[in-house]
């Protein structure tokens, strides 16, 4: 069924198809229909960050930026759903066109620029949703906030989303907000992490529960830079790392239509680079901090490869665009086979 749906959606511009998909998933979620349209994965429970996941395959941030289809996405069988990136104030993002398909490579180039309706709108959608599973909320800074004041935006968002999130992801790795990636390095990173950690402790006391903080990093750092990030995460008491965001590289798509468009490349071509980052992180972290792996999972075995590389959880987005909900089940089954476990029933 998804093959036909994809053929129809791919006749539309990528962003129009994206918007229509969110609308349809949202409507299906409200009616409880989405779970009837696909074979949901069996249960493969895992506990990470102190949270219980029904399976280790989640939706990466970026598909549902405003929380408009939380119930609909959950009904497809994701073990967890991450929404956003959201900023303190609404912003339109970069001019269109800003989203490009590279179907020959099962890839997408985007330069969306954190387009979203703001954190208050997102929280209204979260409160309207019936979903009671693991919900991640991905936070960022507004385009017009100077990088040296970025911490202010992250703290505003953290304050607001904290009571409603299962975990919070701090996005310092989008290539489409000028200067943002500089926050991944040196003193800038440590100052941001220390401010977030201090606020997390204050909020935990206020709300009576500790919401884990994850940091999402880029795949374009050297091994030593990635190792330095890992050490900073340990030193400042972060709870998880998500590896990775999109790449500025164009390896594997040279000569394809839209390959030269500015923006971050996701999908199959980023797979090896992202998995390599997971291996580097795993070597440095030594099991002291969980890794959520994302990047280039277009088949179930790719999810298992990332678990084997050291990840505890995986996320999909571009692969979901190309393969549909069946990829969730394939990934769960591949991870179960890797672990020598048998998934139980359906959830």
From Swiss-Prot:
Listed under GO cellular component are: cytoplasm; plasma membrane
Q: What is its EC number?
A: 1.3.5.2
Catalytic residue list? 174
Pathway the protein acts in: Pyrimidine metabolism; UMP biosynthesis via de novo pathway; orotate from (S)-dihydroorotate (quinone route): step 1/1
Task: Output the GO biological process annotations, alphabetical, semicolon-separated.
Answer: 'de novo' pyrimidine nucleobase biosynthetic process; 'de novo' UMP biosynthetic process
Membrane protein topology class: Peripheral membrane protein
List the catalytic activities from the record: (S)-dihydroorotate + a quinone = orotate + a quinol
Q: Which cofactor does it need?
A: FMN
* Class of the enzyme per the UniProt entry, highest EC level: oxidoreductase
Residues in coiled coil: none
Supply the PROSITE patterns for this chain: DHODEHASE_1 (PS00911)
Could you describe the subunit structure of this protein?
Monomer.
Q: What does this protein do?
A: Catalyzes the conversion of dihydroorotate to orotate with quinone as electron acceptor.
Please give the name of this protein.
Dihydroorotate dehydrogenase (quinone)
Species this protein is from: Azotobacter vinelandii (strain DJ / ATCC BAA-1303)
